[in-house]
Amino acid sequence: MKILILCDMFPPAFGPRMGYLCKYMRRARWEPVVVTEQIDDSTFSFLKGETPVTYVNFFHSKGKILQKLEWICIFILDYFFHYKDKKMAKAASRLLEEGEYAGILCSSYRTFPLPAAQYIAEKYHLPLVIDLRDIVEQYASNEYIAHNFRTFSWLDRKITETFRHKLLRDRNNALRKADQVTTISPWHVEKLQAYNPNTELVYNGYDPELFYPEQHRTSQFVITYTGRLISLATRDPRLLFEAVSRLDREKLIDPDQFRIQWYVDAGSKAIIMQAATAYPVARYMDFFDYVPASEIPGVLNRSSILLQLANTFASDGPKGFMTTKLFESMAVGKPLLLSLIHI
């Protein structure tokens, strides 16, 4: 039975939820067929597998200035005319014309490509399931926006406010038309049931074929964090830094035996280093680039404690974060250090 999946990301780019889903759908004799945006990333190349994928490329320019201009043009076209969704729907329609499909699944972290999925589900009279991995309301501020507009501060606020309104309007319209909605945490379920009562919880989970306990002897006590920090409002390491500073002050640890290892991107490293300036912890920290997702189980199993960062739940704080990293960390059986977490 064929299922058409529209999603904003899919392996080899970051996209574990849909990547793992397709892996196990095929084993259950379903036939997932994917339409997704072309993204230059190979973090999850091992999850591509044999799933047929149509990659829709929206960005073609080379060079920093041309890329910026192209991004602005695409943003404007998409804002006013649903450019990306229309192009995605066109690619999906070609597939639907070629064969029989039992339904459509659309997975998004924000809104795109929900309007495309809504359109083709109505056009071809197919049931629509929407899966929301993240939603705008969960963020403490504007972390859901990948690019800063960098105009005047007052204009930035106006653009952001208008953009947020459009994202929510388009998302909620699609939710109301969906036959089923799935999402990642109890908080998300409660929030989304206001738009579609048929909203169910499907945790991110982990792949037991990759993540399981292993025994490794190490010469150092290692606290490990893998992932991204998009802001201190969402993930705050300062409570950890305060604790390490106290242990250092009381001479209970030393850098030869105690390490904090960060597997993060350059933007996350900058946030961490800025947060650490008020604490004498730099000599305890090591930074590594992202590693392929297939190597993460080994990194976790060679650690002493796995760090999970969050921030205090509040009306203006982060809400409902239950990432794949949390479940993968639990799967390897290591102790978890949770900083200011509320889920």
Describe the function of each predicted region.
Residues 1-58, 180:
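N-terminal subdomain of nucleotide-sugar transferases
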Residues 342-343:
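Conserved small/polar residues in nucleotide/adenosyl-binding loops
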Residues 8, 63-76, 99, 129-168, ...:
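Acceptor-binding helix/loop patch of EC 2.4 sugar-transfer enzymes
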Residues 86, 90, 112, 119-123, ...:
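Membrane-proximal helix-turn-helix segments that form the acceptor-binding/catalytic region
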Residues 257, 262-264, 269-298:
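Nucleotide-activated donor-binding/catalytic signature segment of Leloir-type glycosyltransferases, i.e.
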Residues 215-237, 241-244:
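Conserved donor-binding/catalytic core segment of Leloir-type glycosyltransferases
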Residues 179, 300-319:
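Acidic donor-binding loop of glycosyltransferase active sites
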Residues 187, 205:
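Carbohydrate-associated surface elements
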